UniProtKB/Swiss-Prot annotation:
The gene is speC. Pathway: Amine and polyamine biosynthesis; putrescine biosynthesis via L-ornithine pathway; putrescine from L-ornithine: step 1/1. The keyword Transmembrane helix does not apply. It comes from Escherichia coli (strain K12). One of its GO terms (cellular component) is cytosol. Belongs to the Orn/Lys/Arg decarboxylase class-I family. GO terms for molecular function: guanosine tetraphosphate binding; ornithine decarboxylase activity; pyridoxal phosphate binding. Disulfide bonds: none annotated. SUPFAM superfamilies: CheY-like, Ornithine decarboxylase C-terminal domain, PLP-dependent transferases. The modification N6-(pyridoxal phosphate)lysine is found at residue 347. This is Constitutive ornithine decarboxylase.
């Protein structure tokens, strides 16, 4: 590894004797240094508190030619003799040796060895790519190290990623310690695979699974289609803006849950623990975060295990006001359920795309019949893991754990929360149409009038008070849910927050999203009159100021009713005939009127309410098997009423199934997809990604949606 720098007071930079580069204190963020040298005056300036707050545990030396008392946080006093320079260098070397986490440290050392390989992968450290101009460009674009770090498991020095040996095992043990799990498993093909690993390890045909209707499709795939378990669905909330909410409070009542069992498996209704597994979204895509203690206290005694799908969170234990929501911080006993937590590290933590991790917390039930041992879980793990893993992905998970260790993780997320609060305040100050999704008033005082430090430390400033008009969610109990402060959620005009009804004019969020992308800003997702921006410790005040400025600029376009060709040139140029002479407000009005005509907000809400659930007539696994056998036909969604779905259907994002294999098409689900079909034809350029239904252009030039149903 290249030697790191030494940071020093500006007056000392030229006086230090070191082979390392010496940089001034003001020219570093301390991520590139291995030691710090300060003066006595510096020690009184606040630099020691700053260094402590980083959580980097850097060795700090105080340079003084006179005898001084050693301040707290200083390693030693030096005055410039040769022996002391050696001590400084020794401390810097020691810091470097302890800096890297287990697997990544081993990987970097192995790459530096420069071994000659006759094993796969065939590009042989990139040499194959460099034999062609396109390959050379590819190699130069990504850089040498990514090719050198892509290696075969034929060399055992890095350990085994499938049976968890060597430095790979050490890395996962280290992550388990950081995240407060009993065991942690690194998954290299996303939380879609992580969820399937857990559900395949726990569920079999005939098992009951308590199933959040908000669950990501991967949970349907693993629990219902692959394992064949029988679901008991929990209804969930949607609000008029299109935000995904949480499960209704009444669903956590024991008698209610036992009654649900009587409808699908009456022989299990009175068992002490009728559910093998409950699958709950710890945080929804749109930032509704659950109270894990509350979930376990109300339904835990009915379940062998609870899987908290934490794809959209995972950082909650590093943010004090969110810590209560973390299942991994709970004290559990032998009567509690075992806990699994899956996290999409790549979403808002520090990981390459596809990096995920499974946390297992069940030592408190070890020895009981319901306990899932490591070997059983690892059997499912190997069903879904490649035998040719990409080591940089694994290394990223290792480094992510190191970043989150101790004070550094807490500091990084504290800064993220504060930056997000400042961004919300800026939007409230500069924008009239787009509103942050937070309580407008708390204790009779405007949200934005509280100091940022107060807002960042008290969850009540993000809580969903039951019945409050601003959020529009129904069925919540006190202290059940709160808004994730690291999800910057905005609402757009079109919904009267007081009544939940449509207003005369609206600005569908997809139009705003298109405008932002036209101008180099990429939101995470949008739906109806809501838009989401993910916040991570990567953010800066400058980056968010650019977003706020662009929101204000779009509002000016709305006010000026600018020509569409100026606001959305890509859409206009792709469909010049359709949008000729259109203005921005004209497009907004037309799309808003489409939403109103189909009452899309209520259709979306109804799809996740129990009274509107599609009828279940087959086990999802059986319906899927019929699909694989070809015992299906492709029909227009318009004509699908009363037919049994062979595929799950959904818009993506968010990846939540609206109809599940084995359920009957009709009702709100069918009308919702017909509304989408109308939009595809009426408003080209704004079509959503649909999965499980297929848009086909018929002979008359009209696009229609089709889906597979059982014969």
């Amino acid at each position: 590894m290249k030697s790191m720098n030494i940071a020093a007071s500006s007056e000392l930079v030229s006086r230090l004797s070191s082979h390392r580069r010496v940089v001034a204190l003001g020219d570093t963020d301390f991520t590139d240094v291995a030691a710090v040298v300060i003066t006595a005056a510096d020690s009184r300036s606040g630099i020691l508190a700053l260094l402590k707050r980083t959580g980097f545990h850097l060795p700090v030396f105080l340079y003084s030619e006179h005898a001084v008392e050693l301040p707290a946080g200083v390693t030693a006093v030096i005055n410039g003799n040769e022996q002391q320079w050696l001590e400084l260098e020794s401390a810097a070397c020691q810091y470097e040796e302890n800096l890297l986490p287990p697997f990544y440290d081993t990987l970097t050392q192995y790459v530096e060895m420069g071994n000659s390989t006759f094993a796969c992968p065939g590009h042989q450290h990139g040499a194959f790519f460099k034999k062609h101009p396109a390959g050379r460009h590819f190699y130069d674009f990504f850089g040498e190290n990514v090719f050198r770090a892509d290696m075969c498991n034929a060399d055992v020095k890095l350990g085994d990623l499938l049976i968890h040996e060597g430095s790979a095992k050490d890395a996962q043990k280290f992550a388990a310690k950081v995240f407060h799990a009993d065991k942690t498993y690194f998954v290299l093909n996303g939380t879609s695979a992580a969820n399937k690993v857990v559900t395949n390890a726990l569920l079999t045909r005939g098992d009951l699974v308590l199933f959040d209707r908000n669950n990501h499709k991967s949970n349907h795939h693993g629990a219902l289609i692959q394992a064949g378990a029988t679901p008991v669905y929990l209804e969930a909330s949607r609000n008029p803006f299109g935000f995904i909410g949480g499960i209704d409070a009444h669903c956590f009542n024991e008698e209610y849950l036992r009654q649900q069992i009587r409808d699908v498996a009456p022989e299990k209704a009175d068992l002490p623990r009728p559910y093998r597994l409950a699958i709950i979204q710890l945080g929804t895509y749109d930032g509704t975060v659950y109270n894990a203690r509350q979930v376990i206290d109300t339904v835990g005694h009915l379940c062998d295990y609870i899987l908290f799908d934490s794809a959209w969170v995972g950082y909650e234990q590093f943010i004090p006001m969110m810590a209560d929501s973390s299942p991994l911080l709970l004290e559990l006993n032998e009567n509690d359920p075992g806990i699994f937590v899956t996290q999409s590290v790549h979403k808002q933590q520090a990981g390459f795309s596809q990096t995920s991790q499974i946390h297992k917390k069940d030592n408190h039930i070890r020895g009981q019949a319901r306990f899932c041992p490591h070997k059983r879980l690892n059997n499912a793990f190997m069903l879904h893991a490649s035998t040719s893993p990409f080591y940089p992905l694994f290394a990223a998970l290792d480094v992510n754990a190191k970043i989150h260790e101790g004070e550094s993780g807490r500091r990084l997320w504290a800064e993220c929360v504060e930056i997000g609060i400042e961004a919300r305040k800026a939007i409230l100050a500069r924008c009239k149409l787009f509103r942050p999704f937070i309580p407008p008033v708390v204790d009779g005082k405007l949200w934005q009038d509280y100091p940022t430090s107060v807002l960042a430390s008290d969850r009540r400033f993000f809580s969903f008070e039951p019945g409050a008009k601003w959020h529009g969610f129904e069925g919540y109990a006190a202290d059940q849910y709160f808004v994730d402060p690291c999800k910057l959620l905005l609402t757009t005009p079109g919904i009267d927050a007081e009544t939940g009804e449509y207003s005369d004019f609206g600005v569908p969020a997809t139009i705003l999203a298109h405008y932002l992308r036209e101008n180099g800003i990429v939101p995470e997702k949008c739906d109806l009159n809501s838009i989401l921006f993910l916040l991570t410790p990567a953010e800066s005040h400058e980056k968010l100021a650019q977003l706020v400025a662009m929101l204000a600029q779009f509002e000016q376009h709305i006010e000026d009713d600018s020509p569409l060709v100026e606001v959305l040139p890509s859409v206009y140029n792709k469909y010049p005939v359709r949008y000729r002479d259109y203005t921005l407000r004209q497009l907004c009005q037309e799309m808003h009127d489409l939403y109103v005509s189909f009452d899309v907000k209520d259709l979306q809400k109804a799809m996740f309410r129990q009274q509107s659930f599609p009828s279940v007539v087959m086990n999802p696994q059986d319906a899927h098997s019929a699909y694989i056998r070809g015992d299906v036909e492709l029909v227009r969604i318009r004509d699908a009423e009363g037919r049994i779905a062979a595929e799950g259907a959904l818009p993506y994002p968010p990846g939540v199934l609206c109809v599940v294999p084995g359920e009957v098409w009709g009702g709100a689900v069918q009308r919702y997809f017909l509304a989408l079909e109308e939009g595809v034809n009426l408003l080209p350029g704004f079509s959503p990604e649909l999965q499980g239904v297929y848009s086909e252009t018929d002979a008359d030039g009209v696009k229609r949606l089709y889906g597979y149903v059982l014969k």
